Amino acid sequence: MVVPSLKLQDLIEEIRGAKTQAQEREVIQKECAHIRASFRDGDPVHRHRQLAKLLYVHMLGYPAHFGQMECLKLIASSRFTDKRVGYLGAMLLLDERHDAHLLITNSIKNDLSQGIQPVQGLALCTLSTMGSAEMCRDLAPEVEKLLLQPSPYVRKKAILTAVHMIRKVPELSSVFLPPCAQLLHERHHGILLGTITLITELCERSPAALRHFRKVVPQLVHILRTLVTMGYSTEHSISGVSDPFLQVQILRLLRILGRNHEESSETMNDLLAQVATNTDTSRNAGNAVLFETVLTIMDIRSAAGLRVLAVNILGRFLLNSDRNIRYVALTSLLRLVQSDHSAVQRHRPTVVECLRETDASLSRRALELSLALVNSSNVRAMMQELQAFLESCPPDLRADCASGILLAAERFAPTKRWHIDTILHVLTTAGTHVRDDAVANLTQLIGGAQELHAYSVRRLYNALAEDISQQPLVQVAAWCIGEYGDLLLAGNCEEIEPLQVDEEEVLALLEKVLQSHMSLPATRGYALTALMKLSTRLCGDNNRIRQVVSIYGSCLDVELQQRAVEYDTLFRKYDHMRAAILEKMPLVERDGPQADEEAKESKEAAQLSEAAPVPTEPQASQLLDLLDLLDGASGDVQHPPHLDPSPGGALVHLLDLPCVPPPPAPIPDLKVFEREGVQLNLSFIRPPENPALLLITITATNFSEGDVTHFICQAAVPKSLQLQLQAPSGNTVPARGGLPITQLFRILNPNKAPLRLKLRLTYDHFHQSVQEIFEVNNLPVESWQ
């Protein structure tokens, strides 16, 4: 007979009394040895006590796997004290990864069949916590019987167990569908809450269930209206709101049932208006109900006045002292800004005020919403606010703010001068945080505004003289001084105060940039080229410029050294050609939002005139290997002859006149996958400098109610093509249209072979693993021809 070891309370006191971690380990190891000995000797009297101590040790992070089989023995015992500890141990020590969890299936089945409510409750709790798919299939009939038991205690647990079963095995939806209609007539709030949760899960999993439960929308409306008009109840009211948990759950279900369904939406419109106007907002419980009401109004086909009411509620949330509520309001308004832009615009001053929040998450959300609210009518006022925020915002927000200002200015700039001033302000304030293409965009903008050349070069010269630490600003200034240095010296700009600059000051400033330790190699390249161009624009002697160029002929940076050697050679051997070579750069067409719209229109016009069908390949069997699927030889495909899209194209070629070809039209996007709210879209870009290269951006979005996790997208192409997969932007797609995942595919197709893609998607959705393998044969012809 094993001498009984410590009681659980004594063990806890001894562990807490340990002075060091070594003493704690010593106590636990000693007690675990006693527990092992007791298990080996099969002591039935103290088994539940030993397992309880082992569970406490497990909670402290120490190994307790040797107690798994003891859980099975205690569950099979007829004593309630043993079963209670046994089921608790099973929930803590067992899961689907251990085969031992299947051994308790028969014990759970027997306990569910008994009429003892506490035992049935223990079995249901365990099944809903760690029940695997196999266990759910075996025990579904027993749980279905318990759904209509007279005891509310058992029915509540059976309903929640059914929710777990549907998440594990969606095909069990048909088993639990019939009892739900009867359960909706219950007056017990706990049963109603569980039933609404079960119906919500059924509707998310099964389109048939969604159609079935749209018939009960009037009943749900009646239940919610009763809750709203009900007086104070000590049993259910929280902060003066009648059962806010049940109200929130009903609103979520109504949102699912009313989405894209006109009749259901009309049925619940009046109720939603009643909830939105009668709910008390002085406490957090009322705010929770109001927020869920707003989400429901946003998702269903609600009336226009109701949507304005929802936006106004979110506007009141912005004035709340609770930061969590303000964050929720900003996030929701950001979702609404595309569909209800004018209604959200009314709260623009409050949103801008949120930029000054000390909380980083709040100011980030306010920044995103402020940028989304910019349009052609308020761009000047919004840019002033955003530029003021840029000067004082935290460093982690400065890059996003600068990029957003540049994009908004490019899209809504009222004048070119205002556009240039805005970009210069961003470069001066946060030059090191701007996007890489900001320098190229500004140089193209200045080059295309001939009337602003003198103004731009003087503004940039002044900014460069004050600060040479902002590298993008220095690069643009050096480029502009090199191109338009003659205008800087002429002093004939009427738009700003007169500025007297001589040649020596300009050269000294560029030399300062070259010698600065803060200058990047690319910046020195800009400055060296600017000096070289000034040799044809200045009237003085070029010896100083030649000396600087010759110095960098021995620079350690290879690119800078090569450039200096070439410039020196230009001075020595080709001086007669130097003026022609260093002429001002011609105008460069800018790629922006307006150019994209024009290209889209020309693309649509071209599609109307082209009627050639795109050949498709039959879908291959999914049983073969992913790469071998695409190894088959593709048939010869005949394409219509390419027609010159330019007007009078044949005449131009006949006369041998110079002709600038139009920019290529954008390739249309393609949706290739959609399942339960998860969508996969492909967008295509073919760089003009490398037509054989195709860049495909995979965008995964999620409009369902559950997050998509562990998302992986793999692809394969025929062996005649080369595929390179870039790393995705993440592996989780948030629910309800959250931030999508993007991934870049680089495909090299030098032979212009017909393009086919084989995609394999794996992800977890609603606690279920999903794997899809499919072939994409309808890729646009423009992506490979």
Curated annotation (Swiss-Prot):
Family, as annotated: Belongs to the adaptor complexes large subunit family.
Keyword Membrane: yes
Effect ascribed to mutating residue 372 to G: Greatly diminishes interaction with ubiquitin
Assembly and binders: May interact with AP1S1/Sigma1A-adaptin and AP1S2/Sigma1B-adaptin. Probably does not interact with APB1. Interacts (via GAE domain) with RABEP1, NECAP1, CLINT1 and AFTPH/aftiphilin.
Gene: AP1G2
InterPro entries linked: Adaptor_Complx_Large_Subunit, AP1_complex_gsu, ARM-like, ARM-type_fold, Clathrin/coatomer_adapt-like_N, Clathrin_a/b/g-adaptin_app_Ig, Clathrin_app_Ig-like_sf, GAE_dom
The UniProt record lists the keyword Heme: no
Record-given protein name: AP-1 complex subunit gamma-like 2
Keywords: Cytoplasmic vesicle, Endosome, Golgi apparatus, Host-virus interaction, Membrane, Protein transport, Transport
Protein's cellular compartments: Golgi apparatus membrane; Cytoplasmic vesicle membrane; Endosome membrane
Domain GAE residues, every copy: 665-780
PANTHER family referenced in this protein's UniProt entry, alphabetically: ADAPTIN, ALPHA/GAMMA/EPSILON (PTHR22780)
Chain positions covered by the region annotation Disordered: 592-617
